[in-house]
Amino acid sequence: MKTVIFCTNLPSPYRVDFFNEFGKYCELTVLYERHSSAERNVAWKGTGAENFKEIYLELKPVGVDRSKGSALKNYVKEHLADVLIFTNYVSPATMEAIVWCRLHGRKYYIEYDGGFNKKDPFVKGLLKRFLLKGAVGHLTTADEHIKYLKSLGIDKSKIFKYPFTSISEMDIINANVLTSKGRSYFKQKVGISENKMILTVGRFSYENGYGKGYDILMRLAECMDPSIGICIVGDSPTKEFVDWKKEKGLEHVHFVGFKGKADLADYYAAADLFTILSRGDVWGLVVNEAMTYGLPIISSDLCIAGTELVKDGENGYVVDIDDFETIKQRFLELISDDDKRVSFGQNSFRKISEYTFRQMTENHVSTLLGGVENI
């Protein structure tokens, strides 16, 4: 069985679940730079290592989710593996390890959650080219990010696309069981009195709510019938948004604090429409989760999961975050058309059934290990 060292920043729940699945096919060691992120709720963590070895490195935290120190480089230097993978290449500790690999001829892969096709400042672009072009392969999630990698001079033969996810096949089964009870049942359970419900999930701490486009949702709430509830699940709202709701009398806007996976499932099952109006998400796994519950999606064009998983007129709409009139039109169109929401939701479910941990693992086994037959 091949040995794999996987270097990442945090034990996020979806990563831990993937590692436990991937670890069935290799001798997997996961190196974590940190125990947690400065911007995440302390309850946001994985369940633990079952099929892999986990090591928390002694590194100094930098910013939200990066680290510095030589522990990662030293571990890589002292331990050989058939496959070496880095994820958080913008972290100083990971940069140091990659530079060592380049200088000493150690082969490595880089994996990405996603990303935008953007033009970097000159010096930053040079640094990225040095770090990334030394990799023997790049695993990424989206066509948009593939364009970016190619713009850095990465050969297309070294780029591999994989289905990024936070859901298992059991999650899909459980979602089916929940939604079979009907959305009205779950509206009552979570305390939503409105006839219909628009749901979004994300942190107000991201640019004070503007990063997730909550200002757009508040403007929409002002235009919508109060029988349509807008539910924002995440952390505590900022004072600005609390005051906005009070001053405009938006009683149909509901601010809900952090919810764990089990409680959040009730909100997905209660919703009629899911939206993510982010001003910058390199992926956005809540889109995957919402599609599991058969929800139509309205996503901004700055959420990579939306641009990758949502097809206009099939399972939702991708909208220009700066075009409020079109955004309003799409919301009013979908929330008022029951048949279209059902059709779009069914298409969402079919699409996301291709994005499970099993399929993500099979992709990695094929790309990194040469397929199951070579294990």
Regions found by a protein language model. Give the residues of each.
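Short hydrophobic beta-strand element within catalytic cores of glycosyltransferases
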Residues: P296-S300
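Donor nucleotide-sugar binding/catalytic pocket of nucleotide-sugar-dependent glycosyltransferases
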Residues: K133-Y185, I192
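Aromatic "clamp/platform" in nucleotide-sugar-dependent glycosyltransferases that forms part
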Residues: R279
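A short, histidine- and acid-enriched strand-loop-helix "catalytic/donor-clamping" loop
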Residues: P92, R106-K124, G134-G137, T141, ...
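Short alpha-helical donor nucleotide-sugar binding micro-motif in glycosyltransferases
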Residues: F258-K259, D266-A271
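Nucleotide-activated donor-binding/catalytic signature segment of Leloir-type glycosyltransferases, i.e.
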Residues: F241-A262
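Conserved donor-binding/catalytic core segment of Leloir-type glycosyltransferases
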Residues: I5, K181, I192-K212, M218-A221
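Conserved acidic donor-binding segment of nucleotide-sugar-dependent glycosyltransferases
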Residues: K311-G313, Y317-F324, L332-D339
